[in-house]
A protein has these predicted regions:
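Conserved RNase H-like, two-metal-ion catalytic cores of nucleic-acid enzymes
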Residues: 5-6, 10, 16-55, 71-72, ...
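Active-site-proximal helix-loop-helix substrate-binding element of RNase H-like nuclease domains
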Residues: 154-182, 189, 301, 333-471, ...
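Conserved "right-hand" nucleotidyltransferase catalytic core of DNA-directed polymerases
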Residues: 235-354, 435-632, 645, 651, ...
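Conserved catalytic core of nucleic-acid polymerases
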Residues: 441, 495, 607-608, 612-615, ...
Length: 879
């Protein structure tokens, strides 16, 4: 069986991947989508072809012999987008890490090198496969040379295969005659001129009849139609030049080594680490565990499992300035503790015998009296170690989040690589795979111990550099005064949870069920038949074919029935309005009526997880379950709040900032008119309507106020005229006029927002009033949509982020005040700009005062922060 060589057209495949796949970036803001797509295509072809040899050809920026022959060659080609350009060295770095041969030659194109190696390999009796997105390479196809052309659409790649027979079947000419076609019809992508008036159809007929441009020219009188004949007569020299430009040089002076092109295992430790850095998580499973382990730095770990040894270790740790800790545990069971004194003293302490979880956690609590405890996730430690002073701990994950809030996770191996001089450590998945902590404790203690050590080692080693970076970026104060205290506030909220009436929840579910069934019958009646309302395909047919509703957009899978499509039809078509309500209620039922019942704890309370390292703007998010997405617009949606109740002897106090983002905008922009309006306690939406629509304040209609409200809040989110037109169901021209009038009304706001975009472009980030940074890599994009998104982010992040900082400060101060004053009341929930306090009835007055003082005093703005406060025996009543 013949040996096989796989030749890849580097720039062509990278280009295909770039335009065929969604834009991807890693946490550093680096564009990676083209590299990811390239590797996926390459791996697929390698698995199918199983070549003994592999090489990738790249063009160089220097002119080639074709440019010297014809100065305008490729002259019309647009510059490579910056997002793609920056990935060229990246793919070369990846290929080098995989040990894959790369070839380039000044004065020649990649096509010439591919053609040269293809012919040399064919002469050696090898089978040759060329992978390219460029059909020019079809001229190289033979029975031994296979041309494979990938096509990527919506992330899905299909591949066309061509030997001689397939070229002949599709194009009616032989592979070498592809050159003749180009000579006549030209190639706009390469600016090969061809001859005027001859397209693909005429060129194909001429070459099928005459075989070559030379033969056609010799039999000029036989050429038809007359237009083509005269064009060939007049422009034959141009046809000859075009043929020369289109011909791939298969004899370029390339020094090529088959030894260097020999395929070894591409899944090297270096490639593994690069995949991790680029966050190609789906590719990591291609690497075997040995490779992953080989890529990692070796550290020496010690096991301490006797009582006297542990006592001595903690005494030694107490004399250190800082130590790294980890607590590997499930909610009701500690399995092992990691303790790191420095880079040489790294210990794991497994639970067992006298070394109980309670004993070890008690030792960690006592240790905080003498030294700073550094951990990856302090909130997770607090579940087992009741620490109380933020200044006694360091949260590595929170610090890393502040420095780069665009990452999706902050693991010890990522932080080691980024902040400890590129140190490579095995990830949790490398050590434990999908094994649970309990099972690892029972069966794989060494792996669990190693994981505990790494979890403690990185925080200990990284604290200094992270604090230095926080100082350099001006975010040390945000870390010390907002984020670190917030860890303790959120931990308290998670531990308390919020009480839920199980019977009320069931009753709510039944109400939803009845209404859903009513809607189902109504929709079927309106449609004239029964169908699956949850099937977009069936729904699309009913709405846009049977009922003939306008606006149907048909895709490969049927009509789109997305919410934005249906929203436009709801006002005029009852069935659409009912379908939208049906969808909302079925989601309510599955997510809340049914879903919440599954997460009620033994204490009758739901203990959600509050995340402070998820959103790029600094807002807190909630998961398991998400209590921040409870609907507020529909009455049936609001009713879900009735199931959340305080325990006996308590009531709910709900405190909500009024228009906090608009007040922040007034302060940060310094717009006197907006500031004055707030100081005079005007209805800001009515005032805006009066100014924008030029009507007296007392003549503003409800519709005008509603539209002004949409503009007010839309400006905060950097809304475009298109977005506003969609929100208000008006034309883009009208929306643009509204926005223009708004900026005329509040002139300093426009300058402020433009300044934010400028700041983002200059620095790569924007900042909140408190100094929190939000990177905006999209501002550098050559893609208009991406760049426009970046501009909106630059405009709204400082406002949203400042509002988020204010609510966090308020939460911390409220939590600390209630604790300091020894109250039984507790903060149980935060939703956007709203705080919910489970308040002991005897403490209502003092808690109300604390909320008022701390929420209003959280920031010193040019306009006063306003707080709306209500109380009730359920969240529904309090809201």
């Amino acid at each position: 069986m013949s040996e096989k060589i796989l030749l890849i057209d580097g720039h062509s495949i990278l280009n295909r991947a770039f335009y065929g796949l969604p834009d991807l970036t890693n946490a550093e803001g680096r564009h990676t989508g083209a590299v990811y797509g390239f590797l996926n295509i390459m791996f697929r072809i390698m698995e199918e072809e199983k070549p003994e040899y592999l090489t990738v050809a790249f063009d160089l920026s220097a002119p080639t012999f074709r440019h010297k022959r014809y100065e305008a060659y490729k002259g019309t080609r647009k510059p490579m987008p910056e997002e793609l350009r920056e990935q060229v060295p990246l793919i070369k770095e990846m290929l080098a890490a995989m040990g894959i041969n790369i070839m380039s030659l000044e004065g020649y194109e990649a096509d010439d090198l591919l053609g040269t190696v293809a012919r040399r390999s064919e002469a050696k009796g090898m089978d040759v496969t060329i992978l390219s997105g460029d059909r020019d390479l079809l001229q190289l196809a033979t029975d031994k040379v296979l041309i494979r052309l990938p096509k990527t659409v919506r992330g899905k790649t299909t591949i066309e295969n061509y030997h001689t027979a397939e070229v002949l079947e599709k194009y009616q000419v032989t592979p070498p005659q592809i050159i003749e076609l180009k000579a006549l019809m030209g190639d706009s992508s390469d600016n090969i001129p061809g001859i005027p008036g001859v397209g693909e159809k005429t060129a194909t007929k001429m070459i099928v009849q005459f075989g070559s441009i030379e033969n056609a020219h010799e039999h000029l009188e036989e050429v038809k139609p007359n237009k083509a004949k005269e064009s060939l007569r007049e422009h034959y020299d141009m046809a000859q030049l075009s043929k020369e430009l289109a011909t791939i040089n298969t004899d370029s002076p390339l020094e090529f080594s088959y030894e260097k092109a020999k395929v070894e295992n591409p899944y090297t430790p270096e490639a593994y680490e690069l995949c991790k850095r680029l966050e190609f998580k789906n590719m990591l499973n291609r690497f075997d565990p040995v490779t992953a382990a080989d890529s990692s730095m070796e550290l020496e770990f010690f096991t301490c499992n006797d009582l006297s040894g542990v006592e001595a270790l903690f005494e030694k740790a107490a004399r250190k300035e800082q130590v790294g800790i980890s607590v590997l545990a499930d909610p009701d069971q500690v399995y092992t503790v990691g303790l790191v004194l420095d880079e040489k003293e790294i210990y794991q302490i497994p639970v067992g015998g006298l070394l109980t979880g309670d004993y070890l956690c008690g030792k960690l609590k006592a240790l905080a009296d003498s030294t700073v405890l550094c951990a990856m996730d302090i909130k997770a430690v607090l579940k087992h170690v009741p620490l109380e002073e933020p200044e006694k701990v360091f949260d590595t994950g929170v610090a890393a989040y502040l420095l780069n809030p665009l990452k999706s996770s902050y693991t010890y191996d990522d932080i080691a690589r980024e902040y400890l001089d590129g140190m490579m450590l095995p990830a949790k998945e490398d050590l434990l795979g999908k094994t649970s902590l309990k099972k690892a404790w029972e069966e794989e203690m060494e792996c669990l111990g190693n994981y505990a050590c790494y979890q403690a080692f990185v925080p200990c080693m990284a604290r200094g550099v992270l604090l230095e970076k926080l100082d350099e970026t001006g975010m040390r104060k945000v870390y010390d005064e907002i984020e670190l205290p917030l860890v303790f506030t959120l931990d308290s909220m998670e531990k308390w949870g919020i009480s839920v009436k199980g019977e009320e929840l069931k009753s709510y579910g039944e109400k939803l069920k009845v209404r859903i069934q009513e809607l189902e019958k109504t929709i079927w009646q309106e449609a004239g038949e029964e169908f699956n309302i949850n099937s977009p395909k069936q729904l699309g047919v009913i709405l846009f074919e049977k009922l003939g509703l306008p606006g149907g957009k048909k895709t490969k899978t049927g009509y789109s029935t997305a919410a934005d499509i249906l929203d436009k039809l709801a006002a005029d078509h009852a069935i659409v309005k009912d379908i939208l309500e049906y969808r909302q209620l079925t989601k309510l039922k599955s997510t809340y009526a049914d879903g919440l019942g599954n997460v009620i704890g033994k204490d009758g309370r739901i203990h959600s997880t509050f995340n402070q390292t998820i959103t790029a703007t600094g807002r807190i998010s909630s998961t398991d379950p998400n209590l921040q997405n409870i609907p507020v617009r529909m009455e049936l949606g609001r009713l879900i709040r009735k199931v959340f109740v305080p325990e006996e002897g308590f009531v709910f106090l709900d405190a909500d900032y009024s228009q906090i983002e608009l007040r922040v905008l007034a302060h940060m922009s310094g717009d006197e008119k907006l500031i004055q309006a707030y100081r005079e306690a005007e209805d800001i939406h009515r005032l805006t309507a009066s100014q924008v629509f030029h009507v007296p304040l007392d003549e503003v209609t409800p519709l005008q106020r509603r539209n002004a409200k949409a503009v007010n809040f839309g400006i905060v989110y950097g809304i475009s005229s298109f977005g506003l037109s969609q929100d208000l169901s008006i034309t883009r021209k009208e929306a643009a006029a509204y926005i223009e009038k708004y900026f005329e009304t509040y002139p300093k706001i426009k300058g402020f927002l433009d300044g934010l975009v400028k700041e983002g472009r200059e620095h790569g980030y924007v900042t909140t009033m408190f100094g929190r940074r939000r990177p905006v890599p999209e501002l550098k994009s050559s893609n208009f949509m991406q760049r426009s998104f970046g501009e909106r982010v630059a405009m709204n992040s400082p406002i949203q982020g400042t509002a988020a900082d204010i609510i966090k400060i308020a939460m911390n101060h409220v939590y600390e005040r209630m604790k300091k004053e020894g109250l039984h009341s507790r903060l149980v929930l935060q939703v956007h700009d709203e705080l919910l306090i489970e308040t002991k009835k005897e403490e209502i007055e003092i808690v109300s005062r604390i909320l008022e003082e701390e929420m209003k005093g959280a920031a010193d703005l040019a306009v006063e922060l306003e707080v709306d406060m209500h109380q009730g025996d359920s969240w529904y009543e309090a809201k």
